[in-house]
Amino acid sequence: MHIATFPALAITALALVLWATVATHSSNTNSCHMSYMKPDMIAMTGFNTTQTPLAHKYSLHLYRELDVDLSREVGGRPVLFVPGNGGSMRQIRSIAGEAAVQYWHDPRRAGADADTWANGSTARPKSALQKLNTFAFGDTESDTEGVRGLGDAVTARDMSGDDRRDAVERPLSNGKLPSQWPDDLPLDFFTVNFQEDLTAFDGTTVIDQAEYLNQAIAYILSLYSSHPNPPTSVIVIGHSMGGIVARTMVTLDSYIHGSINTILTLATPHVLPPVSFDKGIVGLYHNVNEFWKTETVPGGKLEDTLLVSVTGGIRDQMIPAEYSSVDTFLPPTNGFAVATTSIPDVWMSIDHQAMVWCHQLRRVVAETLLVVAGETTEKVSTRLDTFQEYFLSGMERVEKKAQNASESSKLTLDTLVSINTPLTTTSNIIINDHSPNQLVKTKSYFKFPVLKASEINEMSRSFAMPVDKGKSLLVKTNMPLEDLHILVCRTNTGDVDTNGFSFLRYGSKSKGVRVGTDTLVCANVAGEAVAMPSSIKYATGAKIPEEEETGEDNDIPVDSAISSTSLSEYIQLDASSLSGFQYVVVIDNTMSETISSDSYLLAEMALPSDMAVVAAPTWWEVLKVGRFTIELPEKRALLTKISLPHFWSSLVAFSIRLSTSDSFSMEYQCEAKKSMGSEHDVLFAPLLMQYSAQLHEAKFSTNLCGGYEQGTRVAVHGGAPYMPLAEGRDVSGTELYLWTDSSSRSSESLSLTLEIDLWGSLGRFLGFYRVMFAIFPMFVFLCLLMIQLRVWTTTELFVSLSDALDVFVDFQLPWILAGSCAIPFVPHVLVSLLYPQMSQPGQFFLGLNGTHLWFLGPVSLVIATGIVVVLHWLLQILTLWVCQCYYMLGLAPIAPESPFSVRRIVTISFLLLLVFKIVPHQFAFMVAVLVMAMGAGKARVGRLMQSEDKDNKSEPCVVIDRNLINYTHSLLLLLVLLLPINAPTLVVWLHNMANKWHTPLESHHEVSAILPILLLVLTASRGIMIRLPQSKRAIYATFAFLAYFALFVLFHGVVHSYRLHLLTNGLCLCLLYLSL
């Protein structure tokens, strides 16, 4: 393969990666609803340079929701918002506006006087109708910004009636009423204008912001000093890199101990920095994580500090979800990480920017903050329980053992009565309509004294089911639990005062009558219910009846149907939890006129073996055909748990399809009737949940109908590249939970097919390895440079990069690709010899924690080679253009001369002085790149002039130094490959200059960091080539350094990319020695 054909392969690989990114991004539809608010930012002018010199650059503001919260004084509980990289202080307006609406539209204060709330607010009381009007249509005298969404500007009158009603009158989620808030105070949201600082690229900027915020918190708390029961801490919300700033605050000397005890982060990369181009940001991450790891233990400085990390999941194309995990530095007693797909009433993936404005998420966040704000003085366990209640799906506790007849769960006996009604018992309890004559499959008939609370009306229906030893109880319903009593009961053994309560129990008809006198003790297990989305009984793309009335297009894709469906509840109690109980009792108190015909309750007892399916295909078995199928047993339970122990890599995405084994498609089964062997319609469509313990991620996929034509995507969040593992934890596989209507299944079995999603996997590959595409080309270039130097030492001919690429592709690349396949198998101890500071395995090369994706190494190197080819072509065009400009200006070609003239010494001394005092060394690096580009272009002038002499048939008057042309071109490519590492810091400096902030960036003003590069550029641009030294030791030393440089780039360059600049300085010193 020669240079003429290889670029086609390389460029094709690049195009596929870019295509995969676009395809992956477009396939995940944003289902967030727009948020609306009326913001008013009040500048806190009292916090100025007398408190901190950073006030020259930053400013503190108080948020108020116009026409909802009219007070301009603080009087609630303080919350501080920290924007992320390039973020705005206005990003808090969605959450803050929602919190204000939820608090001030609380029915308890609808008619309250203004002076009844904290510290004498001047807000005038409004009626509910006035509040609705002012919120929806604005106040023309006071509103300067109108109602805005965090996207396009939206006027107040553009809000639909449903939006206004939802904004004001919707009930709070999780069933928690406003009267249950522990502290009847609003929230005071403070936000900071950081001038859109770029914190992802510079560690110094992060520390500056953290210092400013510590002083700001001291000032905020001082505002409450005259209030009764003043707060002593602030809740901090950080978006993106704002979460790292919040965590950095507690590590600084300026931090007031206890002033922060709750931190909520949204899409924050906690484990690894987004890019590792800056030494400061890499070191800061290491120091902050170590501090949190050592200080969150009992007795540590942060033992009472709570950290909750929320990630948007697969839709976040900027920050991989795995980077938001906290288990590597935080014990479970002090926080957790959760994906938005798990949060009840959200249940969807959210992109990076939408995390602060997505209506479904901000509603839950605001409600949670209102509750937690009153618990800031409580123990960390109390606040942790609150966040877990609102943010976790509940599947984490399905295996939790129920408390046997605990006092808190018993029904009070004096409120119970005994009724003696005919009751059908079976292994299943099925309720899916409200006709009194509904029958279920019968095994035996009992006259059973069903317990019934006094408020239950006489129209209630009662069902009972015996508890089978060794079986688990499974209950799924979409009926409101406040209208159902789901009880587990046992015969009283004398540990409960029965007050003479008794009942009669009859045996089955075939065994005659047996009379006994006993008492029952029951526990209500509704508290064990897990909320989840309903799975509608309509085929994919069908219309939902209740939404057809809106006239909107309600075609429902598989992955987006969650936002359009109602809730369902699931209860699971294992055999140990049911130990000692004899009966499961369901009392249905629902009214037929208030419940739709699609309402159902399904309860059954099932053996663990009926619920568990373990599929353990190897990666080779999957890769051979790209898919594998799991046959589900015919006698399956309501829930089927499918374990995939080998599927843990975050780099592989799957699509899942559900089908039947016979001619009936799954689409037909969802609409199936009794003709399929059922005695009633299908209660619900199959519901799938993917669960990841690391991120507490429960990703639901509803309405799995449509057979092979439709599928749902599954992205695993387990073993991510370069991710350190928490102590005592290993990578685990994937778990899938499938709920199907077991009561209506026919004889055919179901099969679940997992197929590798090629485009989704390529998109994940690019998301994790975007830094790799900027680093690995340096490895390819160093290999090319070694080829050029090897030829030069034997022939004194410095070949072109095109010739070196031919040699590299034909002879070296196949061996390198073969060797890269074996790198995942190299022991960690051997790799650490290149960089002893590497602490954990899986942080070298591609950061793989296993060997099954060994082929990614060759793929990455092929793409890196293609990038070098493209850059080589582009620089050829650039230098030819520069050469043409020199020729048109009549400038002479480059001629070797001493680089140390007085003028040049003065110029370079002045530039170094600027680096030492004012500009970062990255600025001098950019100057070096420009000088090298001009030098490489000027080196070609002689070739252009010789070509003209040939056209004029005259003797050539210019001697062409082809060695110099190739040498300067190679040096230019070397500097261009370093641009991604140096450009971000330069952008930060220019941003600071634009905001008139002239504080030097620490660690970026080292003269030694740029001097070797400047000297080499100065010599090469003046026509001075490298020469063969008399001693071969210098050549051997240069080759040894190049080999080390190349291996470091390959093994550690992605995680420690900032070190490439230092190694390039070493290479420049070697070439400079050969030049002089």
UniProtKB/Swiss-Prot annotation:
> In terms of one coarse class, where is the protein primarily found?
endoplasmic reticulum
Question: Could you tell me where this protein is found in the cell?
Answer: Endoplasmic reticulum membrane
One GO term of the cellular component aspect?
endoplasmic reticulum membrane
Q: Which GO terms describe its molecular function?
A: phosphatidylinositol deacylase activity
SUPFAM superfamilies cross-referenced by the UniProt entry: alpha/beta-Hydrolases
Q: How does the protein associate with the membrane?
A: Multi-pass membrane protein
Q: Which UniProt keywords apply?
A: Endoplasmic reticulum, Glycoprotein, Hydrolase, Membrane, Protein transport, Transmembrane, Transmembrane helix, Transport
User: Which residues are tagged as glycosylated in the record?
Assistant: 48, 119, 404, 849, 952, 966
Q: Which residues cross the membrane?
A: 3-23, 765-785, 815-835, 855-875, 877-897, 910-930, 970-990, 1006-1026, 1035-1055
Q: What's the short name of a Pfam family annotated to this entry?
A: PGAP1
Descriptive protein name: GPI inositol-deacylase A
Q: In which organism is this protein found?
A: Yarrowia lipolytica (strain CLIB 122 / E 150)
